[in-house]
């Protein structure tokens, strides 16, 4: 994945706008042509250059942008991929900092979406929502283990 706006691209846009302003003038000097040639050279070198890498804070910013509220992992989640053999563990730094990576590669490191919980799930109920008899049994079972008739403190 390349950066959204690289320096050569910004330079080309700036140069191109300036050149268009100059074209409106009837007289074109050699300095204007040189300036345009320099801009075209900068643009062509950025187009032929390989994809850029993301490291450090730039990598974290890109992951936060791509994954949003889900969060992300620095290593691939367990069970990732279809190979049964244990391959050496690679992480996002190996894939995007030492080599270039694209948007799909970044998305592979996003945490899965959490399933929406119902408003009244059983675990979400407070102790005050239970009938008194269930509440006493529940509190007794959570503070002590039982083996037969004997109660042991945990």
Swiss-Prot record:
Residues 140-154 have a biased composition (Polar residues). Disulfide bonds join 55-97, 67-110, 96-101. SUPFAM superfamilies: Insulin-like (SSF56994). It is found in: Secreted. Residues 50-78 are annotated as: B. Residues 121-154 are annotated as: Disordered. Residues 126-139 have a biased composition (Basic and acidic residues). Keywords: Disulfide bond, Growth factor, Secreted, Signal. The keyword Transmembrane helix does not apply. Residues 79-90 are annotated as: C. Gene3D superfamilies: Insulin-like. Residues 120-154 form a propeptide. Residues 91-111 are annotated as: A. GO terms for biological process: cell population proliferation; insulin-like growth factor receptor signaling pathway; negative regulation of apoptotic process; negative regulation of release of cytochrome c from mitochondria; negative regulation of smooth muscle cell apoptotic process; positive regulation of cell population proliferation; positive regulation of D-glucose import; positive regulation of glycogen biosynthetic process. GO terms for cellular component: alphav-beta3 integrin-IGF-1-IGF1R complex; exocytic vesicle; extracellular space. InterPro entries: IGF-I, Insulin-like, Insulin-like_growth_factor, Insulin-like_sf, Insulin_CS, Insulin_family. GO terms for molecular function: growth factor activity; hormone activity; insulin-like growth factor receptor binding. Residues 112-119 are annotated as: D. The insulin-like growth factors, isolated from plasma, are structurally and functionally related to insulin but have a much higher growth-promoting activity. May be a physiological regulator of [1-14C]-2-deoxy-D-glucose (2DG) transport and glycogen synthesis in osteoblasts. Stimulates glucose transport in bone-derived osteoblastic (PyMS) cells and is effective at much lower concentrations than insulin, not only regarding glycogen and DNA synthesis but also with regard to enhancing glucose uptake. May play a role in synapse maturation. PANTHER family: INSULIN-LIKE GROWTH FACTOR I. Forms a ternary complex with IGFR1 and ITGAV:ITGB3. Forms a ternary complex with IGFR1 and ITGA6:ITGB4. Forms a ternary complex with IGFBP3 and ALS. Belongs to the insulin family. This is Insulin-like growth factor 1. It comes from Ovis aries (Sheep). The gene is IGF1.
């Amino acid at each position: 994945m390349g950066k959204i706006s690289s320096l050569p691209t910004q330079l080309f846009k700036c140069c191109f706008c300036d050149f268009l302003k100059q074209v409106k003038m009837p007289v074109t000097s050699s300095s204007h042509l040189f300036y345009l040639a320099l801009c075209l050279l900068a643009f062509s070198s950025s187009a032929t250059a390989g994809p850029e890498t993301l490291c450090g804070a730039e990598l974290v910013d890109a992951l936060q942008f791509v994954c949003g509220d889900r969060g992300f992992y620095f290593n691939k989640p367990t069970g990732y991929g279809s190979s049964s053999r244990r391959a050496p563990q690679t992480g996002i730094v190996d894939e995007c900092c030492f080599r270039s990576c694209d948007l799909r590669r970044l998305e592979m490191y996003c945490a899965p979406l959490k399933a929406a919980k119902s408003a009244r799930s059983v675990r979400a109920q407070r102790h005050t929502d239970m009938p008194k008899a269930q509440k006493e049994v529940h509190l007794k079972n959570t503070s002590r283990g039982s083996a037969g008739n004997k109660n042991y403190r945990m």
